[in-house]
Amino acid sequence: MADRPRLPNNSSQTGKVFSRSSYPEYRRILSILRTETVGGALLLAATVVALIWANSPAADGYFALRDVKIGYEPWHLELSLGHWASDGLLAVFFFLAGLELKREFVAGELRKPARAVVPVAAAVGGVVVPALIYVLFNLGTAGETLKGWAIPTATDIAFALAVLAVINTHLPAALRTFLLTLAVVDDLIAIGIIAFFYSTGLQPLMLLAALVPLALFTFLVQKRIRSWYLLLPLALATWGFVHASGIHATVAGVLLGFAVPVLARGKKGEPAEGLAEHLEHKLRPFSAGFAVPVFAFFSAGVALGGLDGMGAALRDPVALGIVAALVVGKAVGVFGTTFLVTKTTRASLDSSIAWIDLFGLALLAGIGFTVSLLIGELSFGAGSAHNDHAKVAILAGSLISALLAAVVLRARNRRYRQVQADEERDDDGDGVPDVFARS
């Protein structure tokens, strides 16, 4: 049988979008995706446990645990466990998001405008179209429901990767890079939405006070100091002041992440990895394996009330808008924007992928969970009827999107295996797959 033709490496060709990155970047992306895949499985398990417990005869125990308050009241930090999970643990998740955002803009796929324009446009389309669809479903209702317009705008990369693991698909490097880049830009937009639209009772003095520990943290990390006993207290102080300022505390995580340098200086004695990579390796397992699953456990539990209760929840315009926005809006926004930008510019697809592959990823982008649940709580308040209906809709819309994406991507798995074989071939034995060695 004749050898399959090798696929060219288009990463350096101008006008190519969704092309392979460099081999070191490819390996870094694989490492991130592996960790997030495990995290996605734990996230799914935590969600299932929360739903079962919240709908069992012992449901009162679940809600009592979620509402247990701990902390120091004089500092306004006596919060329920549910709030500690959303305000505290998710700050670690957003710290890593800040690190990843800075890396992408400084040394990753987003540093070159020609390569950044399509994933950035796709992410924007994946936010704008779902938001518009949600608003259309809620125009004729009381103004309160319109506050949830941002709920279906986020994509959960961990859940999406868990779905890919379940269907055992072998995404080409170009698609993996696009998926991660899309998620990074999506996180940036979500951070902006939370900071500008869901901050209440702004306290300028507290915000100014937060700048002091943030500045000290920035000074230390710029000097490549990585001592946890210096950095951790400053990070906690920054978080505490931002929390007291009225801006959602997770924004502190992003600001701290932005402060960390992503490039190693390469001086004598400098570790092989930069400080950002060091912190990422230390914190990503904690974030994916503990912080996000615990948040999901406390946030996903909702008393469904059987089939009748689910039916009533899904008849709420809030729920209808979320489901339609996740399933239809995300796919149309991501795929449609990508198609339009590509066709109206000199860009073209990498030879390893086709438009049907991008449509499958666009469907996968409709899996919104972690940030969607957070925005739902910020929009309607934890425990409110609209928030409970939003939770049901997020679960339903994400499930439908996952099933549709699985059908499309699974059908392409044979092609993906062929591409993967080419991407792993190393005929010259230099330790770098041949497809990455070509310029």
From Swiss-Prot:
| Gene behind the chain | nhaA
- What superkingdom heads the lineage? Bacteria
* Example GO biological process: regulation of pH
Q: Subcellular localization, per the record?
A: Cell membrane
The UniProt entry, under PANTHER family, shows: NA(+)_H(+) ANTIPORTER NHAA, SODIUM ION/PROTON ANTIPORTER NHAA-RELATED
> According to the UniProt record, where is the region Disordered?
419-439
Q: How does it sit in the membrane?
A: Multi-pass membrane protein
**Which terms in the GO cellular component ontology are assigned?**
plasma membrane
Source organism per UniProt: Paenarthrobacter aurescens (strain TC1)
Start-end of Acidic residues biased regions: 421-431
From the Swiss-Prot or TrEMBL record, give the protein name.
Na(+)/H(+) antiporter NhaA
Per UniProt, the keywords (alphabetical) are: Antiport, Cell membrane, Ion transport, Membrane, Sodium, Sodium transport, Transmembrane, Transmembrane helix, Transport
Tell me what reaction this enzyme catalyses. Na(+)(in) + 2 H(+)(out) = Na(+)(out) + 2 H(+)(in)
